[in-house]
């Protein structure tokens, strides 16, 4: 009887202990989950609902259906220009940053003198204040007094009237911002590639060298395939950050000249917070951007699975 009583009590103790452990676990998760709901989930749901409405923050919310989306793709020339500029920016920054960061990582993964110093120098633009870095960049590419145009004029014979205006020129502003973004971000992705290179198997390179493969063949056929997971991560991060670009445009060109560097996120900010607020219309633009980024990311994931 005593043993039976002990057996009957034991499951209750185990149940109580498991319940207590679950409550402790949920208590650790709860703050993060509550923060996610309050600051991410609820605003997202509200933004989706607001995309089908017109609201300036002062008057009552008015349901307008698909009117905001119809306007975006039919009569809003600024949005269409911003969408085009954003796509151009992504196409320009992703491959350039990828190539530069990978090249730097491969070079600084070798046993060279002052390797750690050069790694730090390469990372400095990324960790430095964007305001300070943008100020230096504007000074370097100043159309009239910048050292780049001075070199072009004095050493390459480019006439003063033919010198590029860089951030102030309609045709060169986007190029300037793309170069700035590549220079600023390639140090960060270099570090990611360095971590990936540390995980590569050196025995494969040694075996290939014994078989007569040169450095380029070893890199192309052995090292690069081992870096596919790292490259996939870098491409995804660069693509998402490219579609969300705002800071660089604000600090370098303020979206100009005209709409030459106006991006979707910069336009969302202008619609929502500059002059007369149009929160419903800004939410509609945000939904379009979200769907676009989601589609591009899904395509990249499926492409990666196909390669694997």
Predicted regions and their residues:
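Short, intrinsically disordered terminal tails adjacent to the first/last structured region
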Residues: 1-10
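A structural signal for multi-pass alpha-helical bundles of membrane permease subunits
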Residues: 9, 18-308
């Amino acid at each position: 009887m005593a043993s039976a009583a002990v057996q009957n009590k034991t499951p209750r103790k185990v149940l109580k202990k498991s319940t207590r452990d679950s409550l402790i676990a949920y208590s650790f998760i709860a703050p993060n989950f509550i923060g996610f709901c309050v600051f991410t989930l609820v605003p997202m749901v509200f933004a989706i609902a607001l995309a089908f409405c017109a609201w300036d923050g002062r008057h009552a919310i008015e349901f307008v259906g698909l009117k905001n989306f119809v306007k975006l793709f039919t009569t809003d020339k600024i949005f269409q220009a911003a969408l085009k500029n954003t796509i151009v920016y992504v196409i320009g920054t992703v491959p350039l940053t990828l190539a530069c960061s990978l090249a730097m990582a491969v070079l600084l993964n070798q046993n060279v003198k002052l390797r750690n110093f050069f790694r730090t120098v390469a990372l400095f633009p990324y960790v430095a204040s964007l305001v300070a870095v943008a100020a230096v960049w504007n000074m370097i590419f100043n159309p009239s007094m910048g050292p780049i145009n001075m070199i072009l004029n004095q050493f390459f014979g480019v006439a003063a009237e033919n010198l590029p205006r860089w951030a102030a020129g309609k045709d060169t502003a986007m190029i300037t911002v793309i170069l700035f973004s590549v220079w600023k971000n390639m140090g960060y992705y270099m570090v990611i590639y360095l971590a990936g290179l540390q995980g590569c198997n050196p025995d494969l390179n040694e075996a290939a060298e014994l078989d007569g493969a040169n450095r380029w063949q070893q890199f192309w056929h052995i090292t690069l395939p081992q870096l596919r997971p790292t490259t996939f991560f870098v491409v995804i991060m660069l693509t998402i950050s490219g579609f969300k670009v705002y800071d660089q445009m604000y600090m370098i060109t303020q979206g100009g000249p005209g709409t030459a560097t106006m991006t979707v996120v910069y336009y969302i900010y202008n619609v929502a917070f500059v002059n007369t607020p149009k929160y419903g219309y800004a939410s509609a633009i945000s939904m379009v951007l979200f769907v676009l980024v989601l589609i591009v990311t899904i395509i990249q994931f499926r492409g990666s699975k196909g390669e694997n």
